[in-house]
């Protein structure tokens, strides 16, 4: 393990229900999510892979794993950020998504950057 601690990574998520692509009568609810990944540490961090756990209101779970995000493995320099938008489909009007990124440091170490659970919900479903 390096004497230097890994960079501090903060993630901000904004979700959006895509009504025009959704089909509630067929249990198809489409959501986009935009994630901004900020590197608040010292040194660069490269996003190597992602892990997502998506759970709908019925408890149905879907795990998504893969290299990078949206076809990229961005290197995020100190005090910089990377933003991308992707999407998911669930069978209920409410769900939750959470996960992490595996990041690589300049010295070849890897660490997890956690993404706290965030809600997927059609507008006005929750008061």
UniProtKB/Swiss-Prot annotation:
It comes from the Bacteria. GO terms for biological process: error-free translesion synthesis. PROSITE patterns: APAG. InterPro entries: ApaG_domain (IPR007474), ApaG_sf (IPR036767), Uncharacterised_ApaG (IPR023065). Pfam families: DUF525. Residues 3-127 form the ApaG domain. NCBIfam families: PRK05461.1 (NF003967). This is Protein ApaG. It comes from Photobacterium profundum (strain SS9).
